[in-house]
Design a protein with these regions (language model features):
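Metalloprotease/metallohydrolase-associated module, dominated by Zn2+-dependent proteases
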Residues: 44, 52-172
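Poly-acidic low-complexity segments
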Residues: 4-7, 50, 129
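Small-residue-rich helix-interface/hinge motifs
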Residues: 14-63
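Generic preference for well-ordered secondary structure
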Residues: 5-8, 12, 28, 90, ...
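Active-site scaffold of zinc-dependent metalloenzymes
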Residues: 1-16, 35, 75-79
């Protein structure tokens, strides 16, 4: 198979697998928290990316946890993946897949940087998880922004340390010999 075709197929196969997985993890984070609080899950949709529930008892800790769990579960899974990453593996698919596996959840952290700024400007989307987290936790948007920046930087540092970025770049730049 032509190397360029292999790279493109790896990219599309990775996205085809990882976008639904990210949605499941994001909504799964909300779902797990709701279930822990005694809620009954009424809908869980991958297409449309949402879940709904009835009931449950949320408190000053669990309500902010519910709003942040959609970010935290995918990021936690990405961190575990990074820790188990094998940098010596030379498979083009593995390197592209691994890059995408950490890019999607790590990139979603940026919303938690942008939304607090919008929140301070009175422009945050009312339905956004980060805005709901700020409202329910009572934390300053600056604290949320700083936490998101630190989490984002930590993920980038670990991905760099594990050579995920370098191996992705090597796979993308590689040419048939």
């Amino acid at each position: 198979m032509d190397l360029k075709v292999k790279k493109i197929l790896s990219l599309f196969a990775g996205l085809l697998l990882l976008v639904p997985l990210y949605i499941v993890l994001h909504e799964g984070g909300h779902t797990l928290t709701a279930v822990m609080c005694g809620a009954q899950i009424t809908q869980f949709r991958i297409l449309g990316a949402y879940m709904t529930y009835e009931g449950g008892t949320f408190n000053a800790f669990t309500l902010p946890l519910f709003h942040s769990a959609g970010l935290l579960l995918p990021v936690l899974v990405a961190l575990l993946y990074m820790l188990s990453y094998r940098s010596g593996t030379e498979s083009i698919f593995y390197r592209i897949f691994s890059f995408l596996f950490i890019l999607i959840p790590t990139g979603s952290i940026l919303a938690w940087v942008i939304v607090p700024v919008l929140y301070m400007l009175g422009q945050a989307p009312q339905t956004d998880d980060a805005a709901k987290f700020i409202d329910s936790s009572g934390l300053s948007p600056w604290v949320v922004l700083l936490g998101a920046v630190l989490l984002f930087a930590g993920c980038l540092f670990l991905a760099w340390k594990k050579k995920i970025f370098q191996n992705y770049w090597a796979a993308v730049k590689s040419e048939a010999s």
